[in-house]
Amino acid sequence: MRNAIEIHALTKRYGILTALDEVSFEVGRGELFGLIGPDGAGKTTLFRLLATLVAPDGGTASVDGLDIVADYKRIRERVGYMPGRFSLYPDLSVGENLAFFAALFGVEIAENYDLIAPIYRQIEPFRARRAGKLSGGMKQKLALCCALIHRPAVLLLDEPTTGVDAVSRSEFWDMLSELKGKGISMLVSTPYMDEAVRCDRVALCDGGKILAVDTPQGVVGRF
């Protein structure tokens, strides 16, 4: 199986608004693929479709070879998803959040600790602190650990560094580069071109449409 994600004419409407308009592209296995575009471009809608949280109104898509409609339950076992807003439990500690998500996926933390260890070691000194009391950068690292705890084949990250400082942003992308080296396929949205250039390829989107798919340098050259 060559592609981790395949999207063909995917469409989503909310009433009279077409949030996604026949979107098509592929993410190769082991690829770090960026989705770049302004607010309202349809990025979050696409992530929600791929994470099987909403159903499409047209077109098809597959994640890790599984159809997002017919195989939605199996996809949820194979995908790690970080939504744009912090979605962990603010009143649970760092350690409790991680344990909760491990239990949710039916795994033991020790099973996949090698995957999250480089990230978790940075927040482990705060493991007793409530998640809601962490800094923005620490929250994102915890959310990434929770998204990885079941060792997903595909990682979906919706603007994971929005609202965090420049140093934390750079550290986060360093972590993504390490995960790519471990064979995890990733689709990451970002409003920042300095982040997009760290991707293998990017899709430029606006108004629910894909305007271009190319290397970051290729997209810059065309626009």
Language-model features: where?
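Conserved ABC transporter NBD signature motif
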Residues: 59-70, 75
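Conserved ABC ATPase signature
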Residues: 130-134
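Hydrophobic anchor residue at the start of the ABC signature
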Residues: 144
